[in-house]
A protein has these predicted regions:
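Helix-turn-helix
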Residues: 1-14
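A short secondary-structure junction motif
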Residues: 2, 26, 30, 55, ...
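Amphipathic alpha-helical packing segments from all-alpha helical-bundle domains
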Residues: 72-112
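C-terminal regulatory/oligomerization modules of transcriptional regulators
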Residues: 62-63, 68-83, 138, 174-175
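Hydrophobic alpha-helical connector segments
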Residues: 18, 34-68, 124-127
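C-terminal peripheral helix-coil segments that are non-catalytic and often amphipathic
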Residues: 100, 104-116, 125-175
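Amphipathic alpha-helical segments enriched in hydrophobic/aromatic and basic residues
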Residues: 12, 16-23
């Protein structure tokens, strides 16, 4: 029941933070599993893009959590976890650490691909947010994406790959 939840969380926002953090930790775990035997940084980045841009199905081997439902919650409510007046205090309490850890993991792949790229962490966080935004648009606001005939995650993957590799392969301009 809702009353029972408040034994563990002081309010709904804290519950949302817990769920969002669980999701980002799970995504990092998935990324580690998918890339542990991959040697090339380009393939690791492509794997990260694929994991972030494709829909999540529930894994019946994990009865304690419904991954598809968790993904849907993060897609529709996740931004509310940090778009608050107390974001600095929450950050100081390390409530966004799982998201930062996932960004750092992907930033490592970016640095390995192009050690001279100046903004690996920014590109990594942008890639994550863009993957979620594009997936959300595909599901709920299809005119924002101008998809061909059907909802196609491959379009999102191609777009993200062009954006990410285009940014990393573009020569840096000096001031």
């Amino acid at each position: 029941t809702e009353a029972g939840i408040y034994r563990y969380f002081e309010n709904k926002h804290r519950l949302l933070l817990y769920l969002v953090d669980w999701y980002w930790s799970w995504q990092e775990y998935r990324l580690l599993q998918e890339t542990k035997n991959v040697t090339g940084p380009k393939t690791k980045i492509q794997t990260a893009i694929r994991l972030l841009a494709t829909k999540v199905e529930d894994d019946i081997s994990t009865g304690h959590i419904n991954e598809k439902l968790l993904h849907n919650i993060v897609m529709s409510e996740g931004a509310k976890s940090w778009l608050t007046k107390h974001v600095e205090a929450d950050n100081k309490d390390k409530l966004f650490q799982p998201f930062k850890d996932l960004c750092a993991r992907i930033a490592e792949f970016i640095k390995a691909y192009n050690p001279k790229y100046a903004f690996p962490f920014s590109l990594s966080s942008t890639m994550i947010e863009m993957a979620h935004s594009q997936h959300f648009y595909m599901q709920h606001l299809p005119s924002m994406k101008k998809l061909k005939k059907k909802k196609n995650e491959e379009d999102i993957i191609r777009f993200l790959e062009q954006m990410v590799f285009g940014a990393m392969d573009c020569p840096a301009k000096s001031k």
